[in-house]
């Protein structure tokens, strides 16, 4: 269960190194070095690969459109998934990639939440990295925290073990 907002946000904030093509994300998967462009007043990531010699990471062509180029495919996938859920006699495994903010304190530990990064420049002109849990609005309009891959994978393993009676 991954909301379209999650896909949209991940695509729109994706960047790549123009030299080695390594992908990162300006909000969700940053590099060691962050830069600031005085002309555009924007922050950018600097590639971590030594061979790239400090290349400035750039937005992939078309990513500014978010999910629009793949919306029909996502809708078709959703329709197929809903149809599959109607099958009887077949055990189901349900995975959630987010947890409502209101429930998070009772159900998750902080390290299970996807970190989101923002940046600001302090008085000494140094870039300050701010880390907070990434909040998304799920498809039901509920403000939620996105989960890291490990807790989702653990849920998958536990449910499969239960279904297989292991």
What do the PLM-derived regions correspond to, one by one?
Residues 1-166:
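Glycine-rich phosphate-binding loop of ATP-dependent small-molecule kinases
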């Amino acid at each position: 269960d991954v909301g379209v907002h999650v896909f949209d946000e991940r695509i729109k904030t994706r960047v790549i190194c123009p030299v080695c093509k390594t992908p990162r994300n300006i909000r969700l998967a940053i590099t060691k070095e962050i830069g600031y462009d005085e002309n555009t007043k924007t922050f950018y990531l600097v590639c971590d690969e030594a061979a790239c010699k400090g290349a400035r990471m750039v937005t992939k062509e078309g990513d500014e459109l978010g999910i629009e180029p793949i919306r029909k495919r996502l809708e078709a996938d959703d329709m197929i998934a809903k149809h599959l859920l109607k099958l009887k006699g077949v055990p189901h495994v349900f995975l959630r990639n987010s947890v409502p903010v209101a429930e998070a304190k009772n159900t998750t530990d902080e390290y299970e939440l996807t970190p989101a990064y923002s940046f600001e420049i302090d008085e000494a002109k140094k870039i300050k990295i701010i880390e907070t849990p990434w909040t998304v609005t799920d498809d039901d309009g509920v403000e939620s925290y996105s989960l890291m891959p490990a807790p989702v994978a653990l849920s998958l393993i536990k449910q499969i073990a239960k279904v297989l009676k292991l």
